[in-house]
UniProtKB/Swiss-Prot annotation:
The lineage of its organism: Eukaryota, Metazoa, Chordata, Craniata, Vertebrata. The keyword S-adenosyl-L-methionine does not apply. This is Cytochrome P450 2B11. Its EC number is 1.14.14.1. Belongs to the cytochrome P450 family. The gene is CYP2B11. GO terms for molecular function: arachidonate epoxygenase activity; heme binding; iron ion binding; oxidoreductase activity, acting on paired donors, with incorporation or reduction of molecular oxygen, reduced flavin or flavoprotein as one donor, and incorporation of one atom of oxygen. It comes from Canis lupus familiaris.
Length: 494
């Protein structure tokens, strides 16, 4: 008994000493931040409304670069376009590491192009960019794929005959099929039961990853991982998707012709076979599955969620939708397919799409980076291995760059002559070496899908515009729009 009392006293004394010391001195002069508690970190400074609210409040007190302890994890937050650009572009190599998202870490464990680090990441990113270019990303062929998929959606929407719909499934299916065509070499019918199951898994998983419980898991995952929670459902969902991808890989193996690769998986299998004698090769089964999952997840969720926000905003602001209808009618007309060449002639529609991305703010706290070496940044020392969050919300809502950031206003992207203007704080895909792999294809999809739908349909809601609520369903790693109902009413179209 005496020994246990002594041990307890020693533990309490140690905790008190840590509390008295505040920030660990061994790491030099870290950016400022609230004093952490042992184990709990800055839990007491966290807002009940989630991590984003917490970080924005701390920014007001500590400035654009500050230190936060997410439980025992030391992290640095970057706020505003200047700090984010200085880190991710001006010091690109030092900030090019990938941090962890606790709720998906057990699934990826540092594999796959998104969550890899070091030479693994560089190798997989080079291969992924080159291969996706070879199979159409950024070329006319992918434009044709998007146009064809948009027409498939138009046919599905015509079948609804103006009946109120939740558009989530339609937008998920449409965007997923573009990635499927590049990665798997095929598209799926909208009623395919396996495809329907996948779409549901993606939707549910993204909502869970962005939930408040997952944000709490981010702080205390080393403890909470032993208990039931949303993290286990996320794990099970993503494992089921990985099992589907593995089945697709096996089908590709059985029918592979090395002289005529059909898609991303074929190209990877050919490279894998070439390097099979190299024990250190990164081209192995695990990296293939996790890279395909990363491309599939990111390529589906980002664009489809942006479109969900976009059409909700069209219901909220019908006068903006009317201007888009007019521009579509003037530039494209009713009888031909919208093309990427039309974008330069449609500055208002392009500005609306930019503003949807800005206002939608899909990844408000960004995907965490990690510094690859000790670095002096703005007079502070950030030690190697420190996770860094580029708070994209702080750039997309900076009043120095967007006059009224809380208001949806396409004029944020129009000059005095009505032409599209660039804004350096517009970074929905992040910036630097870790910029979203699919930025190019996402921009194409948003323009072609958005204009094709509004060329063929006007949109309506049973609710008055002033009664439509834009309050997000979740704000965490991702920001999800509320669930809503919409009618697609035929305008004649193609």
């Amino acid at each position: 008994m005496e020994l246990s009392v002594l041990l307890l006293l020693a533990l309490l004394t140690g905790l008190l000493l840590l509390m008295a010391r505040g920030h660990p001195k061994a790491y030099g002069h870290l950016p400022p931040g609230p004093r952490p508690l042992p184990i709990l970190g800055n839990f007491l400074q966290m807002d009940r409304k989630g991590l984003l609210k917490s970080f924005l409040r701390l920014q007001e007190k500590y400035g654009d670069v500050f230190t936060v302890y997410l439980g025992p994890r030391r992290t640095v937050m970057l706020c505003g376009i200047d700090a984010i650009r200085e880190a991710l572009v001006d010091n690109a190599e030092a900030f090019s590491g990938r941090g962890k998202i606790a709720v998906v870490e057990p699934v990826f464990q540092g594999y796959g192009v998104v969550f890899a680090n070091g030479e693994r990441w560089k190798t997989l990113r080079r291969f992924s960019l080159a291969t996706m270019r070879d199979f159409g990303m950024g070329k006319r062929s992918v434009e044709e794929r998007i146009q064809e998929e948009a027409q498939c959606l138009v046919e599905e929407l015509r079948k609804t005959e103006g009946v109120l719909q939740d558009p989530t499934f339609f937008f998920h299916s449409m965007t997923a099929n573009i990635i499927c065509s590049i990665v798997f070499g095929k598209r799926f019918g909208y009623k395919d039961p396996e495809f329907l199951r996948l779409m549901n898994l993606f939707y549910v998983s993204f909502a869970l990853i962005s939930s408040f419980s997952s944000q709490m898991f981010e702080l205390f995952h080393s403890f909470l991982k032993y208990f039931p929670g949303t993290h286990r459902q996320v794990y099970n969902n993503l494992q089921e998707i990985k099992a589907f991808i593995a089945r697709m890989v096996e089908k590709h193996r059985e029918t592979l012709d090395p002289s005529a690769p059909r898609d991303f998986i074929d190209a990877y299998l050919i490279r894998m076979d070439k390097e099979k004698a190299e024990p250190s090769s990164e081209f192995h089964h695990r990296n293939l599955i996790d890279t395909a999952l990363s491309l599939f997840f990111a390529g589906t969720e980002t664009t489809s969620t942006t479109l969900r926000y976009g059409f909700l905003l069209m219901l909220k602001y019908p006068h903006i939708a009317e201007r888009i209808y007019k521009e579509i009618d003037q530039v494209i007309g009713p009888h031909r397919l919208p093309s990427l060449d039309d974008r330069a002639k449609m500055p208002y529609t392009d500005a609306v799409i930019h503003e949807i991305q800005r206002f939608g703010d899909l990844l408000p706290i960004g995907v965490p980076h990690m510094v690859t070496k000790d670095i002096c940044f703005r007079g502070y020392i950030i030690p190697k291995g420190t996770e860094v969050f580029p708070i994209l919300h702080s750039a997309l809502n900076d009043p120095h760059y967007f006059e009224k950031p809380d208001v949806f206003n396409p004029d944020h992207f129009l000059d005095a002559n009505g032409a599209l203007k660039k804004n350096e704080a517009f970074i929905p895909f992040s910036i630097g070496k870790r910029i979203c792999l699919g930025e190019g294809i996402a921009r194409m999809e948003l323009f072609l899908f958005f204009t094709t739908i509004l060329q063929n349909f006007s949109v309506a809601s049973p609710m008055a515009p002033e009664d439509i609520d834009l309050t997000p369903q979740e704000i965490g790693v991702g920001k999800l729009p509320p669930v809503y109902q919409i009618s697609f009413l035929s305008r004649g179209g193609c």
